[in-house]
Amino acid sequence: MGIYEELVARGLIAQVTNEEEIREMVNNGKATFYIGFDCTADSLHVGHFMALCLMKRLQMAGNKPIALIGDGTTLIGDPSGRTDMRQMLTEDAIKHNAECFKRQMEKFIDFSDGKALMLYNSEWLKPLNYIEMLREVGACFSVNNMLRAECYKQRMEKGLSFLEFNYMIMQSYDFYYMFQHYGCNMQFGGNDQWSNMLGGTELIRKKLGKDAHAMTITLLLNSEGKKMGKTASGAVWLDPNKTSPFEFFQYWRNVDDADVLKCIRMLTFMPLEEIDKMAGWEGSQLNEAKEILAYELTKLVHGEEEAEKAKAASKALFAGGGDTEHMPTTELTNDDFGGGSIDVLTLLVKCGLAASKGEARRLVQQGGVTVNDEKVTAIETTFGCEQFTGDGVVIKKGKKVFHKAVLV
């Protein structure tokens, strides 16, 4: 089985410009491909994780990845999938975010000896002359066609700035520039990028009379059709300081039964033959599959040692074994205990398990809070500071969120 057939079998391919030519290129290690990453945050998240895994798979098959850091396009802002205009970042913030991205990407992609490239599109976008850009590139784009693009159609009613309207041209120019200067013949991206990617292949065809290719990656959706990779508190990040290895592990450990095998197939590097054998698993076997998923992905992102720690902490919660050392923890001081105690509502807010005392009150009243295996039913419940010494207390929110609080 070639790498293209494997990508199809794993359900990773959504759309392609020319399946036959793309198959021949990637199966024979002839693709120099790029994926762009705009620097809108100081960490990559689960959505980027799929792209990084795809780059790793294709590199292992002999193809050459280009990780394009969009420090230039971030100054414009991608309207794809947005109902409002992105917050504009300063150049210093973008530079900081780009450095964070670089450190995380190096865990997945081998950049040694020219096996992969990391490029910054500000290097060619910033020096562009506006009039020259309009004449040389703008003339190749039809406004009528651009307005039919899904990313723009979604924004027309609420307003689309001229700044954002230029994003497709900028992304297309990236592909055109790298095709000329780095031999980049293929672009990969999320399904919401399809219009922008076609803009690049068309620009190359019109300006150079040559063919380039595009392929989109299937969005990671749960069985209800909602994007995965987000929790009630926000995105699931790859930075351990934003989403701890334990929280990352728990996110995947708690996926729905209907989604676990799809996630294993799309995200892990387990052989397809092994995954196919799991197709008939049910009941307790599905819990085993979830643990395999969580362990494999945590190992990929955070390393084997952190994956083992997260697994041990998870077992402490679900099987009564292991330890709680690596559970997300809030450190309390004596100042937090007025009169030597702390009430449950304040405790929930301090630990970040509720955004406000009002939300904490609702959690308790709905029976969603357990402390050290005892359900809290009264909002007036208090805990003495002595309970938080030693191993501290374990707070459970709902069925799947665990947190430890200790006195320091």
Tell me what each language-model feature is.
Residues N28-G36, P65, S172-H181, L221-N222, ...:
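Short, hydrophobic/aliphatic alpha-helical segments
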Residues P79-K95:
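A charged helix-plus-loop insertion that forms the helical arch/lid used to bind
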Residues G77-G81, L128-L134, K226-A232:
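Short acidic, glycine/serine/threonine-rich loops at helix termini
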Residues I204-V408:
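Conserved nucleotide- and phosphate/pyrophosphate-binding catalytic cores
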Residues M1-F33:
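Positively charged, low-complexity intrinsically disordered leader regions
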Residues E21-P79, F188-W194:
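N-terminal catalytic cores of NTP/NDP-binding nucleotidyl/phosphoryl-transfer enzymes
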Residues A51-L58, M178, N196-I204, L297, ...:
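Buried hydrophobic packing segments
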Residues R10, T90-E91, N97-T216, N222:
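Divalent-metal (Mg2+/Mn2+/Ca2+)-assisted nucleotide/phosphate chemistry catalytic cores
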